[in-house]
Amino acid sequence: MRVAGSLVDVDSGRKVEVLTTMPGMQVYMANWVDGEFPHLQHNGVALECQHYPDSPNHPEFPTTVLYPNQTYDERIVFRFLYVCFVFSYKQVN
């Protein structure tokens, strides 16, 4: 598995890493919601591991065809972490 993506909240130190055996990931944001409570605009994100869109029509992409007696085996792990950030800055006059 490999780390396909991660999200970090630098204020709280919360972090989620998404590890997967899949070749691709779609990222969706809550940009389409109308802003009514409890679904505020931009307050959501989805990380969806998957194969590449339109894979059957692109022979250069990993195959999504499953033949008889083959086993489909993919894995996704959401790892939740706490990270500590140390910020320093130099004031420029």
Regions inferred by a protein language model and the residue ranges of each:
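Active-site pocket scaffolds in enzymes
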Residues: 1-85, 89, 93
